[in-house]
Amino acid sequence: MSQNLSAQNSSETPRIKVAIIYGGRSSEHSVSCVSAGAIMAHLDPQRYEVFPVGITHDGVWTVGESDPSRLKTVDRVMPEVQFTREVSLSVNPTTAGELCFEDGSLYAKVDVVFPVLHGRFGEDGTIQGLFELSGVPYVGTGVLSSACGMDKEFTKKLMAAEGLPVGKEVILRGSETLTEEHKRELGLPVFVKPARGGSSIGISRVADWSEWDAALSLAREHDSKVIVEAEIVGVEVECGVLERIDGSLMASVPAQLQDTDEGDEGFYGFDTKYLDDVVTAHIPAPFDAETTALIQELSLKAFTALSCRGLARVDFFVTDHGPVLNEINTMPGFTPISMYPQVFEATGIGYAQLLDNLIEQALHK
């Protein structure tokens, strides 16, 4: 694949104009910034012309940071979008891909958008709807699949409907709380999560019901809908899925996350993922061939069940009785320590080649 891509990279071929959109209104704003910086650093400047677009915490679109080195975590401080000059994307299909300043002058007319946005208002189908209205090609999954993938309730319902193995959970809406019957069914420990969140933000592990109120309050700070999951005893595993340019799918080697029981959170939390300078996974996971093949097969089935496009990362617990699906991430992290680029590197597809595939797939879908 890399030979075919490089063959197109001749001096007379115009560069592909790519808008990298990052930041956003979600609690994963800073993770998105780091992902965007890593992507910009790996895009071949001979092949791509990059136009960064940042979205502030307040949702304002602005000309983004063009220096990837300024979108890194330094001394445990993560970057944020800094406002410079407001821009907006045309929603008129006759001017598809036009990014304009407030005075109507053109910032760029791009060929494709790479929305490196994590969490709500970026990974949940909202911005994908904007791209559909605009008519501009974009990397990743469409409106419905993004919305379902973002919402853990509907992810699990779709997985279960396809006969895929999922764990026990209870959904709480509004002011609802667990009943005594729920508590008996779930047992302890349980994990309390915002239903539409990621990067382990707002998640608590409850080992005693005296911890319940605090855990529920924390989750509701991030979402009015909360999912309470029975703990699954097993190792955490992540597997990447990539849609090739011809539409065929491939699954990466799986990664096994290191045991985090000794940590303060008791699970694979935000600090472990993004701030602590530690090795967090065994890649490839040390499973036998049969277990590895089953994880890859289930990852592809999950991707298809949600009608995903382009890419996804599928998370599992592997128990003594086999893999159990946990969730699917339709725009996984692309930070230097994110699992998605790492598992494909171990599969034989480097970071730059991975980006080439995703952009080409978006342009031809």
Swiss-Prot record:
**Co-factor requirement:** Mg(2+); Mn(2+)
> In its keyword annotation, does this UniProt entry include Metal-binding?
yes
Q: Which UniProt keywords apply?
A: ATP-binding, Cell shape, Cell wall biogenesis/degradation, Cytoplasm, Ligase, Magnesium, Manganese, Metal-binding, Nucleotide-binding, Peptidoglycan synthesis
Compartment(s) of residence = Cytoplasm
So where does Mg(2+) 2 get bound? E327, N329
**Name of the protein in question:** D-alanine--D-alanine ligase
The residues the record assigns to binding ATP are: 183-238
Q: Which GO terms describe its cellular component?
A: cytosol
According to its UniProt record, the EC number is 6.3.2.4
Q: Which organism is it from?
A: Corynebacterium diphtheriae (strain ATCC 700971 / NCTC 13129 / Biotype gravis)
The ATP-grasp domain, residue ranges? 156-360
Cofactor binding, note field: Binds 2 magnesium or manganese ions per subunit.
PROSITE patterns in alphabetical order: ATP_GRASP, DALA_DALA_LIGASE_1, DALA_DALA_LIGASE_2
An annotated Gene Ontology molecular function: metal ion binding
Q: Which family does it belong to?
A: Belongs to the D-alanine--D-alanine ligase family.
Q: Which gene encodes it?
A: ddl
Function summary? Cell wall formation.
Which EC class, in a word?
ligase
